[in-house]
From Swiss-Prot:
This is Lipoprotein-releasing system ATP-binding protein LolD. Part of the ABC transporter complex LolCDE involved in the translocation of mature outer membrane-directed lipoproteins, from the inner membrane to the periplasmic chaperone, LolA. Responsible for the formation of the LolA-lipoprotein complex in an ATP-dependent manner. CDD domains: ABC_MJ0796_LolCDE_FtsE. Belongs to the ABC transporter superfamily. Lipoprotein translocase (TC 3.A.1.125) family. Pfam families: ABC_tran. One of its GO terms (molecular function) is transmembrane transporter activity. The lineage of its organism: Bacteria, Pseudomonadati, Thermodesulfobacteriota, Syntrophia, Syntrophales.
Length: 223
């Protein structure tokens, strides 16, 4: 379970104090699918970066199963992030010189997993997302939807408990975006992964078990 308590994030820009998140409180149960909605500048991406431990809060707490991981040394925090959290972004961020299979394996190899185990996991995941026949292809040889499916497989190779997706269908056409949505929601249902998605897509939000709306760094709706 993730517990967010009075979470605040402030940036200083050109000598001005900018409050991006203003005292958020939220509880996310294990296995939940949660949509985070809001206009650009509402604080959605900053919130997800903190949930993913990519950024630190200015004040407040984010507890993972009761643990305040932001008090940990950076090396321990990075290890927790790699083992526990998967990320899918609007831009796939695949390494252009590597194949689909190699890109998918990368987080596992970085973690020290034996290559054989990483290979087996990556092959299984690429089959699961419908790319069993595209494993040797590099990103430039894949469509936008295929690239994003590789990104989903890569996010899952460490078997994370939490999957964070920031506008995962934002660069895709409606049909392709729907396929990515189906994959993410099926993973949530079948594997019990906690799925947190930032989106402008009301249709996708309606398919999630919960949704919240952010405005000016505050939660204004919760369903």
């Amino acid at each position: 379970m993730i517990q967010v308590r009075n979470l605040k994030k402030t940036f200083i820009k050109d000598g001005n104090r900018i409050e991006v998140l203003r005292g958020l409180d939220l509880k996310i149960e294990d296995g939940t699918s949660l949509a985070i909605l809001g206009v650009s500048g509402a604080g959605k991406t900053t919130f997800v970066h903190i949930l993913g431990t990519l950024d630190h809060p200015t004040s407040g707490e984010v507890l993972f199963n009761g643990l305040d991981v932001f008090n940990w040394p950076e090396k321990k925090l990075a290890s927790f992030r790699n083992r526990t959290i998967g990320f899918v972004f609007q831009f796939h961020n695949l390494l252009p010189e590597f194949s689909s299979l190699e890109n998918t394996m990368m987080p596992a190899l970085i973690s020290g997993m034996p290559r054989r185990n990483a290979l087996e996991r990556a092959e299984t995941l690429l089959h699961d997302v419908g790319l069993g026949d595209r494993m040797t292809h590099k990103p430039s040889e894949l469509s936008g939807g295929e690239q994003q499916r590789v990104a989903v497989a890569r996010a899952l190779v460490m078997e994370p408990e939490i999957l964070l997706a920031d506008e995962p269908t934002g660069n895709l056409d409606t049909e392709t975006g729907r396929k990515i949505e189906d994959i993410l929601l099926e993973l949530n249902r079948q594997k019990g992964i906690t799925l947190i998605v930032v989106t402008h897509n009301q249709s996708l939000a309606g398919r999630m078990s919960r949704s919240i709306g952010l405005r000016d760094g505050e939660i204004v709706t919760c369903a």
